[in-house]
Amino acid sequence: MEDFVRQCFNPMIVELAEKAMKEYGEDLKIETNKFAAICTHLEVCFMYSDFHFINEQGESIVVELDDPNALLKHRFEIIEGRDRTMAWTVVNSICNTTGAEKPKFLPDLYDYKENRFIEIGVTRREVHIYYLEKANKIKSENTHIHIFSFTGEGMATKADYTLDEESRARIKTRLFTIRQEMANRGLWDSFRQSERGEETIEERFEITGTMRRLADQSLPPNFSCLENFRAYVDGFEPNGCIEGKLSQMSKEVNAKIEPFLKTTPRPIKLPDGPPCFQRSKFLLMDALKLSIEDPSHEGEGIPLYDAIKCMRTFFGWKEPYIVKPHERGINSNYLLSWKQVLAELQDIENEEKIPRTKNMKKTSQLKWALGENMAPEKVDFDNCRDISDLKQYDSDEPELRSLSSWIQNEFNKACELTDSIWIELDEIGEDVAPIEYIASMRRNYFTAEVSHCRATEYIMKGVYINTALLNASCAAMDDFQLIPMISKCRTKEGRRKTNLYGFIIKGRSHLRNDTDVVNFVSMEFSLTDPRLEPHKWEKYCVLEIGDMLLRSAIGQMSRPMFLYVRTNGTSKIKMKWGMEMRRCLLQSLQQIESMIEAESSVKEKDMTKEFFENKSETWPIGESPKGVEEGSIGKVCRTLLAKSVFNSLYASPQLEGFSAESRKLLLVVQALRDNLEPGTFDLGGLYEAIEECLINDPWVLLNASWFNSFLTHALR
């Protein structure tokens, strides 16, 4: 029988039948009659559909294959022969677009002219018996049944045979031919007698024994047995009626579905108040580096040695003084702290051998700056149960802050190219499989686009600072250790370079829990005059500490050098994530990769090379008040990387909340743009949830502003 099937039927039909039997665990070498029956059924379904089209007037016409009008719309959608998931997707799509009622079982075809699903039956028994079995199983008036037999008989719902007589005759002739061929080979009797009552392959695929017991134990709540759950899943409608879902909820849920139109959404309301301030753990665009090229000094690679060597490259030190005080701090203590750092570094240089680490003297100014003895004494809760007025201390609501232009400038700067190379990804061996070759090619192209990017500098700076601070917090818990803020890079010519941004002094760090805080004072070099944007530097005390000679097109010029000093704090968990900032490279690479995959699937070949080397093509980068901003693929890579880096640098509960809630509104707007006619309930509540996250965080406020630009242009 198997040989007969392979000779008698089209190879595509044979392949589909093999897949169907494999899917339900049936062996076609044993179940040869089943194999023949599936092939026959598939062929009848395809013949039913062949040559039938709908013209522009909506009339059904029969067109032979050579006819130039074959571009007309097919009258029948073939569902049989697809894998289950795809078949249900097609059925759901038809139901959504035509309003047809969803069938309980997968039908074989959909008739676009009559707007109904069709169940095709091919029987070796009495036609009317088989028809009744089908009707009892389907139990739906909306699915049309059409039965064919090998004897030339037929039966259809309400005697409506759908097809013209010639098309039906073609199918009957083919079935009669199959029967004759089987009879000639002595296969017909076995085939005819093997037909059981109406069933599907899936119904006959029974799970028994231990697997059955495990299946019944693994069901979600409210399902008594596997059959009930299977029926529920088969009938589940992903785009089902929201009202129906709501009706199953608590009686207190009272939601009315409102249509979401272009005029529905309003802009997100950003808070009023004083401008927001810089809150990153280290300076970004305003940082200044003291650098040494091709370092080869004694102790090269030891942070303190490197720092002293970098400090020696600058000769413009002067008596420091305060140019922008911290409003609430004791500014003289910040000034004294810097003087202490300079003095203790000088002491180190006077020693015969420079130590590997430097612990600062615990002076009154450092104790104040690091909050020593400032924390309230912790008392065990069990010892205060009897205190009648025990309560949590009052904390003020955070003051609302408005968006300020400096954060957009910071982001723009992070996307720019520098004149240094900040990452060198290690070689990871030869590529063996083709997929590895493609992955390496993508990684190399991406690295070339972002290795000079300022956001990549921030990654390496963040990794170094957090690693050094966590190490010191564990190794020198009671000491006020001096930690240089260092990064390493290469010049365009390939020369190594070590950079010093400033110093951190760590406070006491007995960090038992992940969230226990270690205080530190940061002192960072800069050429930015804080008086230009004083609101940005609210948390800082800024000193003028020297004059730097800069070369420019018009010759040398002197610029004042500033030191930005502030008290800050971090925790083990924050340092742990800071150490892993390189993940930002991976995240943005994956986003670029999904763009390449989308392009490749359209072109049906890998488009990596074209994607990166076609310099003339521009890509959307983001929304601005001017509209959709576009740029080269390199600019897209750097922008995505900068977004990922800023998400890490400015991580906060406000950002988590805004990202989660605004995503819901974004999905609804995208559904509207895709003409999916979305409906919403409690849109006001969603806006409330979004806007309660807009408090004072500069990065969140900027993202909200971008979201408003997107809303404006998306709904034009």
From Swiss-Prot:
**Entry's EC annotation:** 3.1.-.-
Motif range for Nuclear localization signal 1 (NLS1)? Answer: 124-139
Which BP terms in the Gene Ontology apply to this protein? cap snatching; DNA-templated transcription; symbiont-mediated suppression of host gene expression; symbiont-mediated suppression of host mRNA transcription via inhibition of RNA polymerase II activity; viral RNA genome replication; viral translational frameshifting
Q: Where is this motif: Nuclear localization signal 2 (NLS2)?
A: 184-247
The UniProt record lists the keyword Translocase: no
State one molecular function term (GO). Answer: metal ion binding
Q: PTMs?
A: Phosphorylated on serines and threonines by host kinases, including human casein kinase II.
Q: Which InterPro entries match?
A: INFV_PA, PA/PA-X, PA/PA-X_sf
Residues binding Mn(2+) 2? 80, 108
Do you know which Pfam families this protein is assigned to?
Flu_PA (PF00603)
Give me the residues that bind Mn(2+) 1, please.
Answer: 41, 108, 119-120
Extract the signal peptide range: none
Q: Which cofactor does it need?
A: Mn(2+)
Q: Where in the cell is it found?
A: Host cytoplasm; Host nucleus
Family per record: Belongs to the influenza viruses PA family.
Q: What does this protein do?
A: Plays an essential role in viral RNA transcription and replication by forming the heterotrimeric polymerase complex together with PB1 and PB2 subunits. The complex transcribes viral mRNAs by using a unique mechanism called cap-snatching. It consists in the hijacking and cleavage of host capped pre-mRNAs. These short capped RNAs are then used as primers for viral mRNAs. The PB2 subunit is responsible for the binding of the 5' cap of cellular pre-mRNAs which are subsequently cleaved after 10-13 nucleotides by the PA subunit that carries the endonuclease activity.
What do we know about how this protein assembles, alone or with others? Answer: Influenza RNA polymerase is composed of three subunits: PB1, PB2 and PA. Interacts (via C-terminus) with PB1 (via N-terminus).
Entries under HAMAP family matching the protein: INFV_PA (MF_04063)
Q: What is this protein called?
A: Polymerase acidic protein
